[in-house]
């Protein structure tokens, strides 16, 4: 048959083995003599069968030679993995055993990466993740890529460890140090949804995250769900793929130490927030204090030293060592401790620091209450020009108001408030701040001034002669009003007295007090121009004041006054 003469049958290039049926017990000479003829008849074409029969083994048992399906052992790269020495023939210390294990594992990974034997068997593979594609539509998470990346990361960690433990260690020739090592630390937002882990990790103005990066030397980024606000996310596929994962911190560094240090810092923040209440979290309090300092609203009371003892943790008015009496003083303007009213920073501009009693006693001022109420009242007064106070009364001065005794003299009458009571001044008893020249003595109670007894040295109503109710007219002891009393008689010698001598009651001169004369040896000086009648010694009295009726006639008992002398 023609097909038997062909050296290659079909597309199979592997030569066929010798035939197993028939001719095995025949003479060997026939086969030997037929071999050259057949070879020569085919014009040098190699036959599919073996031309030389192997010699039988010494024990007479024929064995079939098994061929390796991968080729020769010298060319088989995978077969070299089985030749790695794993038997330990000497007594090694623990450090030597660890170094040998590192070296053996690094060599094994290097050979797998060299022959591209990275994908394990079907039974050892894990379920494949969903496919991911880059901007060009190429899949980035293929099976070969994922397993190669895993082996490269493992070899990088082992090489870093071997370079520290094994002296003069040289990594494999095909080893390339990666630019960065990254690792993910997941945040338990599902277990603690009420805790703001992102705010604690980032901090005010990102200072907490920057501090952790500076301390560890690694780059820390927050990725995953919830890391980017809605409407501010990027549209690229790589960023969109990170948004599908859970919230995590992506740590990137060039060495493993930096990554571990950054992981420790991130774990510390997460564990502290999850185990300690928010009010007792020191990190949260420091962040709030730092944010207040950045905004300019910080009042650092905790770290401020006490002005009394110098210790930190309390103010001077709460100091246990009471050595400074100023710390116990309470300001009556703002209600705070540690300063007087004259030094109060909340005192209104232009107001007096004294808070005298005066007549009015303790009248409520506008400034009483907390600082917010005082500022609001002051603002309303400045805007409206006279806003009512908290008690509905017209606004008054906080200190040195219209009812504060001697401070009332610099206040205009129309600026004075209503009187503190409806009782007449002469009916008020027990006024401590009266002078000795007021309206009568304390023991007279509610008696009017004209009914009060005259005291020595007083110069009120009825004190001087010629006035209303003068003692000479007997009106000091009567209870009638001066306008209901009879006119007193004129004093003798009224022509030389000052005032209206002919009209009693109009300021007659005091008895025994005449007009002063000229000094010895001098004449009476002339009166000033235009005022001849108002000068002492003037002969003619001034005309009576105009009125509705004529002046009363003089009493009939008394003689008429003498005519004026020329």
Curated annotation (Swiss-Prot):
Coiled-coil stretches: none
Name listed for the protein in its UniProt record: Branchpoint-bridging protein
Subcellular location: Nucleus
Family statement: Belongs to the BBP/SF1 family.
Compositionally biased tracts (Low complexity): 473-486, 494-513
GO molecular function: mRNA binding; zinc ion binding
Function of the molecule: Necessary for the splicing of pre-mRNA. Has a role in the recognition of the branch site (5'-UACUAAC-3'), the pyrimidine tract and the 3'-splice site at the 3'-end of introns.
Bias (Basic and acidic residues): 341-352, 394-413, 429-441
Lineage: Eukaryota, Fungi, Dikarya, Ascomycota, Pezizomycotina
Listed GO biological process terms: mRNA cis splicing, via spliceosome; regulation of mRNA splicing, via spliceosome
Bias (Pro residues) ranges: 517-531, 540-566
ZnF (CCHC-type) residues: 304-321, 329-346
Keywords: Metal-binding, mRNA processing, mRNA splicing, Nucleus, Repeat, RNA-binding, Spliceosome, Zinc, Zinc-finger
Bias-annotated ranges (Polar residues): 1-14
Disordered: annotated span: 1-77, 341-367, 382-566
PROSITE patterns (alphabetical): KH_TYPE_1, ZF_CCHC
């Amino acid at each position: 048959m023609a097909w038997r003469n062909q050296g290659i049958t079909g597309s199979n290039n592997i030569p066929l083995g010798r035939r197993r049926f028939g001719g095995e017990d025949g003479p060997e000479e026939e086969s030997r003599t037929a071999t050259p003829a057949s070879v020569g008849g085919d014009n040098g074409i190699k036959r599919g069968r073996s031309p030389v029969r192997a010699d039988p083994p010494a024990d007479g048992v024929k064995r079939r030679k098994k061929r390796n399906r991968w080729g020769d052992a010298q060319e088989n790269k995978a077969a070299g993995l089985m030749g790695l020495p794993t038997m330990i023939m000497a007594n090694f210390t623990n450090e030597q055993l660890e170094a040998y294990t590192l070296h053996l594992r690094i060599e094994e990974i290097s050979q797998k990466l060299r022959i591209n034997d990275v994908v394990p068997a079907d039974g050892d593979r894990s379920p494949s993740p969903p496919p991911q594609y880059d901007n060009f539509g190429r899949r980035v998470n293929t099976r070969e890529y994922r397993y190669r990346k895993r082996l490269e990361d493992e070899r990088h960690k082992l090489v870093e460890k071997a370079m520290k433990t094994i002296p003069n260690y040289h990594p494999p020739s095909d080893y390339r140090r990666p630019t960065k090592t990254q690792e993910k630390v997941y945040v338990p937002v599902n277990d603690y949804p009420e805790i703001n882990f992102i705010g604690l990790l980032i901090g005010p103005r990102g200072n907490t995250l920057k501090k952790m990066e500076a301390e560890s030397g690694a780059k820390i980024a927050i990725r995953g769900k919830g890391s980017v606000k809605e409407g501010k996310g990027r549209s690229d596929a790589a960023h969109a793929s990170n948004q599908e994962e859970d919230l995590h911190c992506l740590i990137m560094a060039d060495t493993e130490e930096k990554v571990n240090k950054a992981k420790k810092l991130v774990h510390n923040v997460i564990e502290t927030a999850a185990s300690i209440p928010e009010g007792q979290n020191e990190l949260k309090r420091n962040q709030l204090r730092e944010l207040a300092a950045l905004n300019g609203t910080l009042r650092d009371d905790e770290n401020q030293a006490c002005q009394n003892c110098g210790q930190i943790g309390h103010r001077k008015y709460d100091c246990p060592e009471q050595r400074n009496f100023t710390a116990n003083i309470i300001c009556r303007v703002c209600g705070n401790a540690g300063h007087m009213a004259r030094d109060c920073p909340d005192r209104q501009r232009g107001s007096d620091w004294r808070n005298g009693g005066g007549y009015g006693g303790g009248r409520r001022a506008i400034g009483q209450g907390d600082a917010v109420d005082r500022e609001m009242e002051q603002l309303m007064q400045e805007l409206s020009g006279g806003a009512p106070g908290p008690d509905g009364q017209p606004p008054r001065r906080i200190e040195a108001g219209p009812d504060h005794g001697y401070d009332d003299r610099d206040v205009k009458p129309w600026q004075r408030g209503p009187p503190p009571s409806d009782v007449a001044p002469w009916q008020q008893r027990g006024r401590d701040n009266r002078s000795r020249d007021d309206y009568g003595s304390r023991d007279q109670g509610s008696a009017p001034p004209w009914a009060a007894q005259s005291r020595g040295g007083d110069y009120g109503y009825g004190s001087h002669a010629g006035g209303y109710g003068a003692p000479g007219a007997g009106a000091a002891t009567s209870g009638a009003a001066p306008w209901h009393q009879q006119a007193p008689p004129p004093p003798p010698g009224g022509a030389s007295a000052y005032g209206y001598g002919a009209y009693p009651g109009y300021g007659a001169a005091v008895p025994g007090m005449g007009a002063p004369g000229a000094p010895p040896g001098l004449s009476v000086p002339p009166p000033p121009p235009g005022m001849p009648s108002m000068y002492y010694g003037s002969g003619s009295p001034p005309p009576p004041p105009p009125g509705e009726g004529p002046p009363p006639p003089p009493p009939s008992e008394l003689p008429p006054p003498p005519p004026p002398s020329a």
